[in-house]
Amino acid sequence: MIRVGITGNTGCLGMMLAARIRGNRETNLIAFERSWFNEPEMLQHFVAHCDWIIHFAAISRDGDGERLYQTNMRLLEQLLAAVTTTQFSGVVALASTTRYAGKLPYHKSKRDGAALLLKTATENAFRSSVLLFENAFAPGGLPDYNSVVSTFCANIAAGIECKIDSDAQLTLLSAAEQMDQLMEKILAGNIPVTMTFKGAVHLSVSELKEKLEIMRTAILNKQIPRFETRFEYELYTTLRAYCAGLTD
């Protein structure tokens, strides 16, 4: 039985991964509470019962950039202190982003966090991985926060016109697909030092809007479109969650 602990298990990605771990006979989800970051003994107890630790806990937005950076670094430092104290020998995987090279404090916290994780792993003989997630979307995402997909889905479901200020190119991959790929690594017992996720789709903002509008029409007509790719299926599933009640 592979014992997996998830920090940030109440977030979109954390909840999705937790559901997969609970539903697999080969894995056991180790309970975690965010308050344990401030309780060293509880955090050590958590770490001691894990074979894998997936560290999602972080904040991605805050009006105070320095506070965001310090919070994200502090959470990782507290986790690594428990890892060191318990002589943990499993895998610690840090959730990051393909856009880690950006200039925002969030991006800096991911860069510095990755460097700290690798240094600590090298000094303490546990395995580490940095998970470079693509721009993810899923049912339950927060509009104007998690993803442009969440924002567009909420607006289109409500019949609100989506304004496009810049028809930029997007790189999207559903949270479900990324969690499936991460589960494969956990079950295989092997993960690269830096993990990227396959299957991302590239499209413009206007193309995304057009796809969602076509899907909304299908939902209102109680039709299920033919999906050419899993991306289209996951996009439809996400929009449908925002359209709940429209077809009653």
Where are these regions (language model features)?
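N-terminal Rossmann NAD(P)H-binding glycine-rich loop of SDR-like oxidoreductase domains
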Residues: 2-21
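A short beta-strand-loop structural module common to alpha/beta enzyme folds
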Residues: 28-37
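NAD(P)H-binding glycine-rich loop region in Rossmannoid oxidoreductase-like domains
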Residues: 36-78, 82-85, 97-103
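Short-chain dehydrogenase/reductase
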Residues: 69-70, 103-114, 142-146, 172
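Conserved Rossmann-fold NAD(P)-dependent oxidoreductase catalytic core, especially the SDR/UDP-sugar
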Residues: 74-115, 119-124, 128-131
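NAD(P)-dependent short-chain dehydrogenase/reductase
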Residues: 118-128, 134-170, 175-187, 211
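Mid/C-terminal beta-alpha module of Rossmann-like enzyme folds, strongest
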Residues: 177, 181-248
